[in-house]
Amino acid sequence: MRGQLVGLLLASVPLLALAADCDVSNIDKWDCGHPGTQQPDCEASGCCWVPVGVRNATEKGIPWCFYPSDVTRPPNACDDGFNWVASDPGFTDEYYNIMYQNYLANLNIQGSGAVVAAPDQETPGGSYYYHWMRDAGLSIKAWLDINDNDYSKVKTELDAYAGWVKKVQHKTDPNGIDVRIEPKFTIPDGEPYTGGWCRPQTDGPALRAMAMSKWGMIVKDNGGDTASIWEVVSFDMAWVLENWQSEGCDLWEEVRSTDFYFNRMAYIYSLNEAAKFADAVGQDGATYRATADEIKAATQSHFKDGFLYESTNRPYDGAVIHSIATFGEYLFPPESEESAATIKVITKAFCNEYPINQEENAAGKPGILIGRYPGDSYAGGNPWQLLTAVLGELFYLGGQNTYKKIEARGDYSLRYSENKEWISLLNLPEGSTARDLARAQVAAGDAVMTRLFDHVQDAAGRIDEQIDKFTGKQSSAEGLTWSYANILHSLYVRKSVAKYLD
């Protein structure tokens, strides 16, 4: 429960007028009480009560006792902002190499071409020894990126992955849906999982086609045959072209919508990548680009009330941070004001959510840990390594893109009207220049990664799914491929931006 550190102070809260101002947005509600507090006790203490407090879409029936807006809350380590300054990301080259090998071990698992979500078969959520289409698409993209698209370095894994895709793409789905939107498959045989699950998962075809388009362009550049790769890309893209407005499950496989920001951004990005691949192999990419532009126009409205929201039934979500970092070049890029505003809202929410953040903020520790969404309860509802890493990457990308602007036009003074969100987020003084902003963005990325490293240090370099919100220890699925992918990718971007630093 958010505000655990102050929840036990209920009895000490002075009695307040019953007409207290209870018009408080969900993101700013601060728990007044403790689990099990009832309405009479809540209101007798001058706090606000809602019988149906919409913390998130999966807890609609849970009531909420919270402080009114006109009350001075107990001191909160999240109210004074964050320490966004560190001089390096914490992770050493040696540690990077260990994680790289652990990551590689999860690709082409058992020589099947599959990407195992994690080798752990005894997690709080059951076995992770499956190939998730989403995890695989994102992890393969990261694998190509961190290896600089070097054909010789990635050929073995990508040839195997391409073979896997061809095998599963035309399976008959016993669940009665198009197999292209099936969430996960058994390893090594590649059969659709038949247990109960949130279906369909509509970002899957886009993410798979994204990865295969990137691989296809590498093969083309190295004189290889791309015909079979084009077949799998065009087959997945055909689904996206016809069905991008259809209802599906969210990134976390819990709620449904036709309008998830993550899914929309995955469509836009993958359509543009497929268009590039089409052009390279003599196909027509115009339809892909036109559809990407159509989706982009329909997605502009997700910036509302000062931040980018994931969906109407799950507005505050770390998936948005992932979207900006991974797909943002086509809409609301990492260096944008919308990006900074969203970081501000999301980080405040997760500081309030996790006692470990409050404790470490109070101690002045740089950075922050973030998770899926406020009110999450899966496996303890903790910070996630893959999301914290992608927040670090988002800062790095913001700095990199700011440096590129400086390269094009020289250093320049920041105009408050054009940069107020970044100035506010990073506490930049009056008179700051673009170079000051870029340095601060990189330092903020280092702050996030440094805090993450403090919690994941392990002799074997194993990176898990979550970090316990009370103890700060790694928890849940062990050796999560997606965690390796995002941490390594963030550090890869950090290395690429290093050339700009004085």
Show the residue positions of the predicted features.
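Cleavable N-terminal signal peptides of Sec/SRP-targeted secreted and luminal proteins
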Residues: R2-A19
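Secreted, propeptide-processed cysteine-rich mini-domains
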Residues: L18-D41
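Extracellular Cys-Trp
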Residues: D31-H34, D41-Y67
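Low-complexity, Ser/Thr/Pro/Gly-enriched N-terminal "stalk/linker" regions
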Residues: R73-R134, A160, W164, V168-K184, ...
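Well-ordered alpha-helical scaffold segments within catalytic/enzyme domains
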Residues: D80-P89, G137-S152, L207-G223, A266-G282, ...
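Extended ligand-binding clefts on enzyme/binding-domain cores
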Residues: E94, M133, K166-R199, F260-I268, ...
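Aromatic-rich carbohydrate-recognition surfaces in CAZymes
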Residues: S127-N243, R264, I487
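CBM-like carbohydrate-recognition segments
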Residues: N175, V179, K184-F185, D376-L387, ...
